[in-house]
Protein backbone atom coordinates (compact mmCIF):
# COMPACT_ATOMS: atom_id res chain seq x y z
CA UNK A 1 0.00 0.00 0.00
CA UNK A 2 1.36 3.42 -0.98
CA UNK A 3 1.74 5.70 2.02
CA UNK A 4 0.17 9.14 1.58
CA UNK A 5 2.49 12.13 1.36
CA UNK A 6 2.96 13.32 4.97
CA UNK A 7 1.50 16.67 6.01
CA UNK A 8 2.20 18.79 9.07
CA UNK A 9 -0.51 21.36 9.73
CA UNK A 10 0.09 24.48 11.81
CA UNK A 11 -3.10 26.38 12.59
CA UNK A 12 -3.72 29.35 14.83
CA UNK A 13 -4.85 32.96 15.06
CA UNK A 14 -3.24 35.94 13.36
CA UNK A 15 0.13 36.87 14.88
CA UNK A 16 0.73 33.57 16.67
CA UNK A 17 3.94 33.01 14.69
CA UNK A 18 2.60 30.09 12.69
CA UNK A 19 3.72 31.45 9.32
CA UNK A 20 7.32 32.00 10.39
CA UNK A 21 7.49 28.64 12.15
CA UNK A 22 5.91 26.80 9.21
CA UNK A 23 8.30 28.34 6.68
CA UNK A 24 11.33 27.49 8.84
CA UNK A 25 10.05 23.96 9.42
CA UNK A 26 9.52 23.39 5.69
CA UNK A 27 13.05 24.62 5.07
CA UNK A 28 14.52 22.35 7.75
CA UNK A 29 12.71 19.29 6.40
CA UNK A 30 13.12 20.15 2.71
CA UNK A 31 9.34 19.91 2.27
CA UNK A 32 6.84 21.93 0.28
CA UNK A 33 5.16 24.87 1.97
CA UNK A 34 1.61 26.20 1.86
CA UNK A 35 0.67 29.52 3.42
CA UNK A 36 -3.09 29.12 3.11
CA UNK A 37 -3.75 32.47 4.73
CA UNK A 38 -1.74 34.04 1.92
CA UNK A 39 -4.18 32.54 -0.59
CA UNK A 40 -7.00 34.55 0.95
CA UNK A 41 -4.79 37.64 1.09
CA UNK A 42 -3.81 37.03 -2.53
CA UNK A 43 -7.46 36.75 -3.50
CA UNK A 44 -8.33 40.00 -1.71
CA UNK A 45 -5.29 41.68 -3.30
CA UNK A 46 -6.12 40.35 -6.78
CA UNK A 47 -9.76 41.39 -6.37
CA UNK A 48 -8.69 44.95 -5.69
CA UNK A 49 -6.32 44.91 -8.68
CA UNK A 50 -9.03 43.54 -10.97
CA UNK A 51 -11.78 45.79 -9.63
CA UNK A 52 -13.78 42.94 -8.09
CA UNK A 53 -15.97 43.84 -5.10
CA UNK A 54 -15.39 41.67 -2.02
CA UNK A 55 -19.12 40.96 -1.79
CA UNK A 56 -19.37 39.69 -5.39
CA UNK A 57 -19.24 35.96 -4.66
CA UNK A 58 -19.45 34.72 -8.25
CA UNK A 59 -16.64 37.00 -9.45
CA UNK A 60 -14.51 36.03 -6.44
CA UNK A 61 -15.12 32.33 -7.18
CA UNK A 62 -13.87 32.73 -10.76
CA UNK A 63 -10.87 34.75 -9.57
CA UNK A 64 -10.05 32.14 -6.91
CA UNK A 65 -10.15 29.29 -9.43
CA UNK A 66 -7.65 31.06 -11.68
CA UNK A 67 -5.21 32.50 -9.14
CA UNK A 68 -1.69 32.14 -10.56
CA UNK A 69 0.40 31.75 -7.40
CA UNK A 70 3.68 30.14 -6.38
CA UNK A 71 5.48 29.88 -3.04
CA UNK A 72 9.28 29.78 -3.08
CA UNK A 73 12.15 30.00 -0.62
CA UNK A 74 13.63 33.45 -0.05
CA UNK A 75 17.16 33.93 -1.36
CA UNK A 76 18.54 34.47 2.15
CA UNK A 77 17.05 31.15 3.26
CA UNK A 78 14.69 32.79 5.73
CA UNK A 79 10.98 32.81 5.03
CA UNK A 80 9.18 32.52 1.73
CA UNK A 81 8.58 34.54 -1.42
CA UNK A 82 5.04 34.73 -2.80
CA UNK A 83 4.58 35.25 -6.53
CA UNK A 84 1.21 36.34 -7.95
CA UNK A 85 0.80 36.55 -11.72
CA UNK A 86 4.59 36.72 -12.06
CA UNK A 87 5.02 39.52 -9.51
CA UNK A 88 6.64 39.32 -6.07
CA UNK A 89 3.84 40.41 -3.71
CA UNK A 90 5.32 39.04 -0.47
CA UNK A 91 5.29 42.42 1.27
CA UNK A 92 2.39 43.98 -0.65
CA UNK A 93 -0.16 41.51 0.74
CA UNK A 94 0.92 41.88 4.37
CA UNK A 95 -0.73 45.19 5.23
CA UNK A 96 -3.74 45.38 7.54
CA UNK A 97 -6.16 46.44 4.77
CA UNK A 98 -5.43 43.32 2.73
CA UNK A 99 -5.61 41.26 5.94
CA UNK A 100 -9.09 42.56 6.70
CA UNK A 101 -10.16 41.80 3.12
CA UNK A 102 -8.75 38.29 3.43
CA UNK A 103 -10.79 37.63 6.55
CA UNK A 104 -13.87 38.96 4.74
CA UNK A 105 -13.54 36.70 1.69
CA UNK A 106 -12.56 33.72 3.85
CA UNK A 107 -16.00 33.87 5.46
CA UNK A 108 -17.67 33.18 2.10
CA UNK A 109 -18.46 29.45 1.57
CA UNK A 110 -18.16 29.75 -2.22
CA UNK A 111 -14.61 31.12 -1.88
CA UNK A 112 -13.51 28.46 0.59
CA UNK A 113 -14.84 25.72 -1.70
CA UNK A 114 -13.06 27.21 -4.71
CA UNK A 115 -9.73 27.35 -2.87
CA UNK A 116 -10.02 23.95 -1.16
CA UNK A 117 -8.82 21.88 -4.12
CA UNK A 118 -6.09 24.40 -4.84
CA UNK A 119 -4.76 23.93 -1.33
CA UNK A 120 -4.89 20.13 -1.51
CA UNK A 121 -2.83 20.23 -4.71
CA UNK A 122 0.18 21.46 -2.72
CA UNK A 123 0.45 17.99 -1.13
CA UNK A 124 3.41 16.61 -3.04
CA UNK A 125 6.44 14.48 -2.11
CA UNK A 126 8.47 14.49 0.01
CA UNK A 127 5.97 16.26 2.31
CA UNK A 128 4.03 19.42 3.03
CA UNK A 129 3.96 21.94 5.86
CA UNK A 130 0.64 23.79 5.70
CA UNK A 131 -0.15 26.80 7.85
CA UNK A 132 -3.51 28.49 8.23
CA UNK A 133 -6.67 28.41 10.28
CA UNK A 134 -8.41 25.20 9.15
CA UNK A 135 -5.59 23.06 7.77
CA UNK A 136 -5.97 20.35 10.40
CA UNK A 137 -9.76 20.48 10.68
CA UNK A 138 -10.89 20.83 7.04
CA UNK A 139 -8.16 20.69 4.40
CA UNK A 140 -5.87 17.92 5.71
CA UNK A 141 -7.87 16.10 8.43
CA UNK A 142 -5.67 13.01 7.92
CA UNK A 143 -2.41 14.86 8.65
CA UNK A 144 -0.20 12.76 10.97
CA UNK A 145 0.92 15.84 12.93
CA UNK A 146 -1.32 18.80 13.71
CA UNK A 147 -0.17 21.84 15.66
CA UNK A 148 -2.42 24.61 16.99
CA UNK A 149 -0.25 27.61 17.83
CA UNK A 150 -1.62 30.34 20.05
CA UNK A 151 -0.45 33.46 21.90
CA UNK A 152 -2.22 36.16 23.87
CA UNK A 153 -3.87 38.94 21.84
CA UNK A 154 -1.58 41.45 23.57
CA UNK A 155 1.56 39.56 22.59
CA UNK A 156 0.36 39.10 19.02
CA UNK A 157 -0.36 42.83 18.74
CA UNK A 158 3.08 43.61 20.16
CA UNK A 159 4.79 41.36 17.61
CA UNK A 160 2.85 42.89 14.74
CA UNK A 161 3.62 46.40 16.03
CA UNK A 162 7.37 45.71 16.10
CA UNK A 163 7.22 44.10 12.66
CA UNK A 164 5.43 47.08 11.10
CA UNK A 165 7.61 49.64 12.89
CA UNK A 166 10.73 47.89 11.59
CA UNK A 167 9.26 48.23 8.11
CA UNK A 168 8.85 51.97 8.65
CA UNK A 169 5.06 51.98 8.96
CA UNK A 170 3.24 54.47 11.19
CA UNK A 171 1.22 52.20 13.50
CA UNK A 172 -0.66 52.38 16.78
CA UNK A 173 -0.42 49.49 19.24
CA UNK A 174 -3.92 49.99 20.65
CA UNK A 175 -5.42 49.99 17.16
CA UNK A 176 -3.54 46.82 16.24
CA UNK A 177 -4.80 45.10 19.39
CA UNK A 178 -8.37 46.08 18.55
CA UNK A 179 -7.99 44.80 14.97
CA UNK A 180 -6.57 41.49 16.19
CA UNK A 181 -9.43 41.01 18.65
CA UNK A 182 -11.98 41.82 15.95
CA UNK A 183 -10.35 39.37 13.54
CA UNK A 184 -10.26 36.68 16.23
CA UNK A 185 -13.99 37.12 16.74
CA UNK A 186 -14.71 36.92 13.00
CA UNK A 187 -12.52 33.87 12.54
CA UNK A 188 -13.86 31.92 15.53
CA UNK A 189 -17.53 32.78 14.99
CA UNK A 190 -17.86 32.30 11.22
CA UNK A 191 -20.29 29.62 10.08
CA UNK A 192 -17.85 27.88 7.71
CA UNK A 193 -14.62 26.36 9.06
CA UNK A 194 -14.32 28.47 12.22
CA UNK A 195 -10.89 28.81 13.80
CA UNK A 196 -10.51 25.99 16.33
CA UNK A 197 -7.97 23.27 17.10
CA UNK A 198 -8.49 19.82 15.63
CA UNK A 199 -9.40 17.24 18.27
CA UNK A 200 -6.03 15.52 17.79
CA UNK A 201 -3.96 18.71 17.53
CA UNK A 202 -1.07 19.52 19.85
CA UNK A 203 -1.70 22.97 21.32
CA UNK A 204 1.31 25.25 21.85
CA UNK A 205 1.12 28.67 23.52
CA UNK A 206 3.93 30.79 22.08
CA UNK A 207 3.32 33.86 24.27
CA UNK A 208 6.56 33.33 26.20
CA UNK A 209 8.40 31.20 23.64
CA UNK A 210 10.85 32.24 20.94
CA UNK A 211 10.40 31.10 17.34
CA UNK A 212 13.36 28.75 17.77
CA UNK A 213 11.82 27.19 20.90
CA UNK A 214 8.54 26.57 19.09
CA UNK A 215 10.40 25.12 16.10
CA UNK A 216 12.40 22.73 18.29
CA UNK A 217 9.26 21.49 20.03
CA UNK A 218 7.64 20.71 16.69
CA UNK A 219 10.80 19.04 15.36
CA UNK A 220 10.74 16.83 18.44
CA UNK A 221 7.20 15.75 17.54
CA UNK A 222 8.32 15.11 13.95
CA UNK A 223 11.13 12.88 15.21
CA UNK A 224 8.80 11.01 17.58
CA UNK A 225 6.54 10.17 14.63
CA UNK A 226 9.44 9.43 12.24
CA UNK A 227 7.84 11.71 9.64
CA UNK A 228 11.04 12.97 8.05
CA UNK A 229 12.10 9.51 6.93
Swiss-Prot record:
A single Gene Ontology CC term: cytosol
InterPro entries linked to this entry: Cytidylate_kin, Cytidylate_kinase_dom, P-loop_NTPase
Highest taxon of the lineage: Bacteria
Cross-referenced Pfam families: Cytidylate_kin (PF02224)
Reaction equations catalysed: CMP + ATP = CDP + ADP; dCMP + ATP = dCDP + ADP
Leading EC class: transferase
Keyword Transferase among record annotations: yes
Entries under CDD domains matching the protein: CMPK (cd02020)
The name this protein goes by in its record: Cytidylate kinase
Amino acid sequence: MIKPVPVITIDGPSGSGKGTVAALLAGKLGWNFLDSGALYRLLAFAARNHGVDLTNEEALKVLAEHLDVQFGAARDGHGMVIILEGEDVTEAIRNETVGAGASQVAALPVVRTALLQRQKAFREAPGLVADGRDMGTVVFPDAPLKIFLTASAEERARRRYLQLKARGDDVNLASLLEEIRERDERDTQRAVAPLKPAEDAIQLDSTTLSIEEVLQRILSEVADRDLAG
